[in-house]
Amino acid sequence: MRRSGSKESTIVYSALSLAQAGRGPEALALLEPLKSTPINSLELLDIIQAVYDDQKKGEESFVFWEKFLQTYGKQEKNLLAYFKASIRIKSLSHQRKAAVELQKNFPSRKHTLWVISSLYLLSKKSENEVEQRLLKALAEKTAKLIFEKPTGYIDSCEEFHLYLDVLLLVGDKDRALDALIHQDADRFVDADADLLLRKLELLASCARWDSLFTFSLSLFQTGNTDWKVCKALLDSASNDDSKLVPLKDCILKALSTSSTKRNLHLLWIEASARFFPEEHESALLGYIKKLYMKPIVFEDLRPYLLKLNVDAQHRLLDAFKLADLGESNESQKVDKLYAEVLLLKIHFLLFESFTAESVVDYVRRCFVAFEKGLSLSKGLLPTDFTHGYEALLLAVHSLIYMWEGNKDLKPAEKQALIFDAICLLEKGITYSQHNFHLKLPLIRLYLLLDGGFPAAAKVYDTMSIKQIQNDTLDHYLLTRATTYYPSSVTSHYINSSLKIYGSNEFETPEMISMAYEDGAYSQIEDMRNFRSRLDHSTWKSISLVERARIHYLTAFKPPKQYLPKCSSPKDNRDLKVFADYGSDKLPTVEESLRNSPKPDTLWIHLTVIGHSLVQDSIVNGDFEKAVLSAKEMEVLCENNDLSKQLTSEEIVHMKLLIQLGLLSVKVKNGDYENSSFETIENLIESFDYENSTPLSQLTKYTEIINDLITCLNSFLYHVSATKKKEFTRQYQLLKNISSNKLGSISGITKHKKKAARKYVSELLSNSWLSNLSETQVPYDPKFAKQVGEGMIDSYIQTTDAVSKLPKFVKF
């Protein structure tokens, strides 16, 4: 910059460098003088826009665009770049403006459709009623000109979708339906399944039950058994009793000719549940007898089975007999095995309690079924799931519910039950190496054991998680990852998890632009919603917090860019991917296997404010801001049940940060009271740990002490001269207490490392499965010891990571 003076490119690239280093305000200040002069390069405009967008000020960047267009003319190339820039920044107002300019200067049908789409999206987003009415009127008027006769026409299915969107936007459902049922629309409806489904939805929404039944019945009779078609039949019959007999006749006729179609059975089961209760049990039994070999059958039947009374449940089980099934060839043997597993699932669903006595016989039956499955799976590909693997999963679920619900078990016995479940799943994976149904609970089980994170991560690495799944599945491993394994390895996992959000920022706008170019209007709103869900993802915020924590705990002060900036988080975490066989009275297995409360918006807000209170406010001597942050945290703590999202150690951490924030200004002004320090002293003294304290708690205690010492160091620097001597005494007292606590943590981690083998040997010696007499467990003691060796390595790696933390506390 010194060499080139005010050269635009140098200033712009310098601003980009500052923004990437987390110095966003300085980057914006550097770009400010350029607002008065037109930028002569589209590339530089894109960089300027990216810098402003990084600071959540993307709208301001259009000052540069307007100057550019005024100076260099509204050529089509420039206006197209302006349109795409608007998409990148999610500015619908500028997108509409760019589309209007394109249509005005370069008239075409495509540009007019861009105007309609932009008006539609903008009116849906607008919160101003007057503006909303105006935008709707403009969208409707433009759509009428281009789509309706005599001036217009519809040229494709995508244009039809856009036309319907506008009509539904203005609340004209009847007009939209009339357009769909007109004979001119038939070729589009026949060619586009989504248009057909929209027609079904509009017929139901407009309460045209006769037309809905006739149309859906015609589809059904020609072989279309899509569930939305089936639902349309059910809805029309629900609103018109005269349709019940024809509905029953058409279903039974279809079942008589195609008895293995899943949706036909589900339609009959639902219809019998609603309209023909005397035939409901028969419908359920018919589905079981025809499709028992399909694993999905249990998931389909589960809600209906739970509604049956006990007598009906037992009648159903008695009516389906394994002895009636043939097994003269390999295929029949496999089918019979799936029937056996289905019955095991239903019995699991009907369990009232999971005591050791009630579980023993059931687990034995599961093991027998699993062994049968292995003998029948020898010809499968390595990527296939072994036959009957769910029998093993059912045994594991039994152990999990017994572990959770049996209060008489000693802690060592409960830990051993977890290890039993781990060994079962590890054995299952040796036969079914790509089975995520086994791997996800295995990850959670490892995390329930002290020092289990590296072992869990090793399993997670084998799952080949796609980038798109990072937002939905990474939470199974990485929730509170810093607490459970504070190392550079964790930082690597978190950075990998965050890559999808960078891809979303750059790739999704390009996909939206391509959709406009290709005229794929039905996809644009879905793409925008997808982009928004990732932009405001709850997991994104949690991951950014964890990245800040891991940098902070391992001697690196994180720049501000590491802190979450998204508001109104959208929770995309997949909590239902776990197989679930239990009744509604039980918590799901996913809930049972959580090693800590599920963090959500409250956790994010408290953690971000607390981190900022220490690193941004107190460290920099901005104590007035620290007080405001502390009061904000105080309100959040008072108005919420913290235990639903925070661990007990995190609650203590928040209380300490509130105390430090409120104390900061008083220390600076010299009007604090010694009782304030006594409160903090008592809080730190309450940290009670021993050799059996989990490593995760030691990590959190170290983090709390680190925050305390960081704040005390700043207080010592900023305290008023008149109180310096007195404060130094308080500082020294708290420092000594903290040093002793850190010394104890170091001593405990050393002891834990030495006792790693003893810890795992206790898991093996207390095994519940190995003590079951006359039970053939699917793994031998040698295999359990191999799993134990892996757990020892995991435990030692974790103790090494935790033992390093006290060294990074800066006194």
From Swiss-Prot:
Signal peptide: none annotated. GO terms for molecular function: acetyltransferase activator activity; actin binding. It is found in: Cytoplasm. It holds the Pfam family NatB_MDM20. The keyword Glycosyltransferase does not apply. The keyword Lyase does not apply. Its main location: cytoplasm. One of its GO terms (cellular component) is cytosol. Belongs to the MDM20/NAA25 family. Component of the N-terminal acetyltransferase B (NatB) complex. This is N-terminal acetyltransferase B complex subunit arm1. It comes from Schizosaccharomyces pombe (strain 972 / ATCC 24843) (Fission yeast).
